[in-house]
Amino acid sequence: MGTADSDEMAPEAPQHTHIDVHIHQESALAKLLLTCCSALRPRATQARGSSRLLVASWVMQIVLGILSAVLGGFFYIRDYTLLVTSGAAIWTGAVAVLAGAAAFIYEKRGGTYWALLRTLLTLAAFSTAIAALKLWNEDFRYGYSYYNSACRISSSSDWNTPAPTQSPEEVRRLHLCTSFMDMLKALFRTLQAMLLGVWILLLLASLTPLWLYCWRMFPTKGKRDQKEMLEVSGI
């Protein structure tokens, strides 16, 4: 009986070889899992960096919106021009502040309503920035004709025709008026340059979510295509 039992137990020895093969397959699977995990780590880092960039763009929208409204208030010192009558600096700044605030609220609370409102305000901020830049261009080209003729006031019937003879007081008054108008023109040109920079930055800030979306989609599509190629090749 003992010999028969030993003969029956002998064929079971190759099972150890089967176990060794199974362990080898598990080690290959573990390597594959480690590779996938290492590939996922940069995505988490990229998502963290993109979220920080989004928060920075929202803060920039709020700060630049307030700055746009403040700079636009200074333009009411001058005569009524296109930037003053349109109120471009004020409504552009207001829309930018609302867009940044809505983005922060959606980040904290979520919800379909806040998502829709954030999208609409982002599109409105982009549109108002473009419209403000168009108005800025028109005002910069035609908004200074008043300063060139404001000091040409005389006692003659034609206001644009200087008097034949000017007294020393009239000459001094004309010189002071011209100097004052030159300083005023330089001041408002500086304010216009600052507004131009603010509106360009607002335009870029409103485009940041679109850039981040494209930046996320294109690498993901490339990795998906690479994964499909590896699956087809049998790796």
Swiss-Prot record:
Broad class of where this protein is predominantly found: membrane
GO cellular component: membrane
Keywords: Membrane, Phosphoprotein, Transmembrane, Transmembrane helix
Membrane topology annotation: Multi-pass membrane protein
Residues with PTM Phosphoserine: S38
Keyword ATP-binding: no
Coiled-coil boundaries: none
Bilayer-spanning residue ranges: 55-75, 86-106, 113-133, 193-213
Keyword Transmembrane helix: yes
InterPro entries, alphabetized: CD20-like, TMEM176A/TMEM176B
Compartments in which it is found: Membrane
GO biological process, one term: negative regulation of dendritic cell differentiation
Entries under Pfam families matching the protein: CD20 (PF04103)
Subunit details: Interacts with MCOLN2.
PANTHER family documented for this protein: LR8/HCA112, TRANSMEMBRANE PROTEIN 176A
Family from the record: Belongs to the TMEM176 family.
Name of protein: Transmembrane protein 176A
Organism: Homo sapiens (Human)
